[in-house]
Each structure stands twice: as structure tokens, then as C-alpha cells.
Amino acid sequence: MSMQTLQASEMRPLSKTSIVNVPIAVFLGLGALLSQSVQASTIEGINHTHWAINHFSVDGRSGIDIIGPYQGGGGGCCYIAPQRWQRGMTVRVDWETGVAYPDGFPGFADRPKYLAWRDEMRSHKRQHSKVVTVPDYTGQKVCGITVHFLPCDDIQVTTSCYAYGSPEYPIKTPLQLPEPQSCPK
């Protein structure tokens, strides 16, 4: 087998079509690779407690909304789920709870009374953080992530595209859960 060396005079310059097609092919290839690796969508929350969810985040990304007792909300962007679920996948959820409908607002005219009321309301705020497993979504479309806030500072998450309450939705927990007398430690 002989090796031939091309001489400069034997080389042909790239055509204009080739010069344009190479970057397009690279761009389309990267786009296909990225579309296979991630899916991004909203961060939602369902509150099953009598507390207000003042704010929450999933892996540092804000859920945006304040969620009242026994309500849903959110709409922050974006939870990015890998295309393929892997055993041991988790998310970290940080949230703050507080009094939903504070009683006894004294108004602003009597500043000492107002400040005492404000301090009382602030004393009920609690910061929470929990790492939870992302359920297996193999073979399913991923539509962001929904965090369910449960009594005893517990949470569940799902990536389901179905609406809460529909028969196909994976979390069947009733919206209005009774608060237990005490929570497990």
C-alpha cells in the first residue's frame, strides 16, 4: 500500500456550500445533543397545610409565589430534569412557612401596637430545608416539578404532566389534611 501526499496544487478549496453547511451541521448536532440531555419547565407548589408558604425554591430556583393554606401556586422558572431518570436523583427544597391570615392587625396609627403585632407574626415564621428523591419518570414526559407541602414539615415531589386531582396524577394526598397533634421526630 503506498501513501500519497497531496500537493498544494492538487487540493481543492471548500465550496461556499460546504463552508455554510459545516457550521449548520455542528449547530444542529449540538441542539440535538442538548435536547436529549435536559428538559426545563416550571416549579409549582401544592400546600396541604394551614400555614402559608411564604416562599420556596427547588435546587436554588425560586417557585415565585406565596401559597396560602390548602392552595396551589408557583410558576417559577425553571426546573431542569435530565432526559433520563437515574436512581438516587434528588432535589433540595427550601421553604418558609408563616401565619396565613394574621388576626388582630392594629393598623399603623399606634406604632408600638403595630410593632408588637409585627414581631408576633414574624415569630411564627420557620425556615425549612429538605432533600427528597425525585420519583422515576422513565417513559414519561416531564413537566417541571411540583412540590407538595405536607403537615409535619414533610414534602413530596413529582414531575408529572397531569393536573393535581386528575386520576393519572401520582400523588393522591387530599388537599386539606388534618394537622396531627404531634409530629414524628
Predicted regions located by residue number:
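N-terminal secretory signal peptides that target proteins for export/translocation
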Residues: 1-16
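Boundary at the C-terminal end of the N-terminal hydrophobic targeting segment
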Residues: 38-40
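Structural motif
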Residues: 43-51
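Beta-strand-rich cores of mature extracytoplasmic or soluble domains
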Residues: 97-185
